[in-house]
Amino acid sequence: DGTFARHSEDDDLPGDGLLTGIGTIDGRKVAFTANDYTVKAGSLGQMGVEKVIRIQERAMDLNVPMLRLVDSTGARLNAEEREPGDTHMDRYTGGKMFYNQCIHSGQVPQIGVLYGPDIAGSAYIPVFCDYLIMVEDISGMTIASPRIVRAMTGEDVSGMQELGGPHLHARHSGTADVLLPDEETAADRVRDVLRRIPQNYSERPPTVPAAPPSRNPQAPHQVIPAAPTKAYDAHAPIDRLVYPASPPRLPPAIPPPP
């Protein structure tokens, strides 16, 4: 959608730096957006924002999952991007993207993959996703870049990984659901997630043949303490209620500190 947006003779802004469309992954229809970092560092321009809004509306019409492949430095701030006093991130354009993500919530699944940096207003996109994958060493998500932090506060940070890298979001902010070693593994995880979830809120999730739980299902009360303030291992009751073929648990992306 919008392949020829911002097309020019010198082809400065092909597709306005954003690909959108509808395709299939293992037979499942999915709507997607993908930033093109080779065009203005994946920044969001006027036409790019319009393309996002259109594909979001199409996903809602079709009731299909929304896949966000993010590699962006945020909103494009060039003077030529707007009229005097106007902005493409207001409530009817850029703000509409986030409104649509709120409307999607609970209706169609939203899966995000950070294949690179995600800075400023664009950093809200993955936060709204239901399931967020970050990739070791290349993902990053911050409201302000290291350069802006240095300019505004005088504080030096070594780079995106220190300021908003995957380790920070997996261990401290809790924004990342899983941290994976490379882009190929991230793509495989997207396929696995799609296999295990329904297309939308009105469909039942995929089913598999039932099997007994790995532990005695008759005794969950034996592993849950009577005192509501006492901590316990949550895996113990789960093992007594859920059979092994159920969706895998989300392992801790980063081991907890000692």
Model-derived features: positions:
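Gly-rich Lys/Arg/Thr-decorated short loops/hinges at beta-loop-alpha junctions or inter-strand turns
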Residues: D1, V30-V39, L77-E80, R150, ...
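Non-catalytic terminal/interface segments that mediate subunit docking, oligomerization
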Residues: G2-A31, M60, A226-P258
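Short alpha-helical segments and helix-capping/turn motifs at coil-helix boundaries
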Residues: H7, D16-L18, K51-I55, M97, ...
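Glycine-rich anion/phosphate-binding loops
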Residues: D12-D16, K40-E57
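A structural preference for short, pocket-lining loop segments at secondary-structure junctions
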Residues: G23-D36, K51-E81, P258
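Flexible beta-alpha connector loops of hexameric P-loop NTPases
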Residues: T38-M47, E80-H88
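Conserved catalytic cores of soluble enzyme domains
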Residues: V70-S202
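Terminal amphipathic helices with adjacent charged low-complexity linkers/tails
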Residues: V178-H235
